[in-house]
């Protein structure tokens, strides 16, 4: 079976000239459909940089990086956009639009992707909000939600269009244990039912048991645990 993500010998640099610094050193990794891979390691070790490269949010400088069978090194902007449309992103910052309710923030992802008719948007948004324990908060504005609730809305927004790959950067950082486990279990169910792999950056040892593999990055080098 072809891996959803295949990374071979990826190097990445920040800066120019004498200030150029290597962030990733020869990273190689395959992620199979439905596999959950956790990335751990100290801050500044390159975890988030690798995540954004896989998500076609940053240009691949050296090495090979294939997602859904498409090579991202040297890829045209149109191909990168097509790859991004098939990915669900969950970042540390929820980035909710303050003038939209929780439900409307989730619906917006469906409008942007055009994956359903307008009539089905509300039902899908309410269903995924209920799955993350926010059915009663669906029509509330972000300003009235706690930090943990806002993050759960962001997770719902990433999951609502049934992505083929989930990239998550510290998705449980602002959640208590119960809420964090609820959210990662939802992501795990999607991974196993839909064959949707997850690459998740975390410092949260409480969620290690959901992983198929746990890898560590130190000084830009990928290490097995």
Where are these regions (language model features)?
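Conserved catalytic motifs of ABC-family nucleotide-binding domains
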Residues: 162
């Amino acid at each position: 079976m072809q891996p959803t993500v295949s990374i071979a010998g990826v190097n990445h640099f920040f800066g120019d000239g004498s200030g150029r610094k290597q962030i990733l050193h020869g990273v190689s990794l395959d992620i199979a459909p439905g596999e959950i891979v956790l990335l751990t390691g100290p801050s500044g070790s390159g975890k988030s940089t690798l995540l954004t490269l896989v998500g076609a949010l940053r240009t691949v400088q050296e090495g090979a990086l294939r997602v859904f069978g498409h090579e991202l090194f040297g890829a045209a902007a149109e191909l990168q956009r097509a790859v991004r449309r098939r990915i669900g992103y969950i970042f540390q910052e929820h980035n909710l639009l303050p003038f939209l309710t929780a439900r409307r923030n989730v619906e917006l992802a469906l409008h942007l992707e055009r994956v359903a008719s307008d009539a089905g948007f509300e039902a899908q948004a309410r269903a995924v909000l209920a799955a993350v324990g926010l059915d009663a908060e669906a029509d509330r504005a972000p300003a009235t939600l706690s930090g943990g609730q806002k993050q759960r809305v962001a997770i719902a927004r990433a999951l609502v269009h049934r992505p083929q790959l989930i990239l998550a950067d510290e998705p449980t950082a602002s959640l208590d244990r119960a809420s964090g486990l609820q959210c990662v279990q939802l992501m795990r169910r999607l991974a196993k039912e839909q064959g949707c792999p997850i690459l998740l950056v975390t410092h949260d040892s409480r969620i290690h048991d959901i992983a198929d593999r746990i890898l560590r990055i130190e000084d830009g080098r990928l290490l097995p645990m």
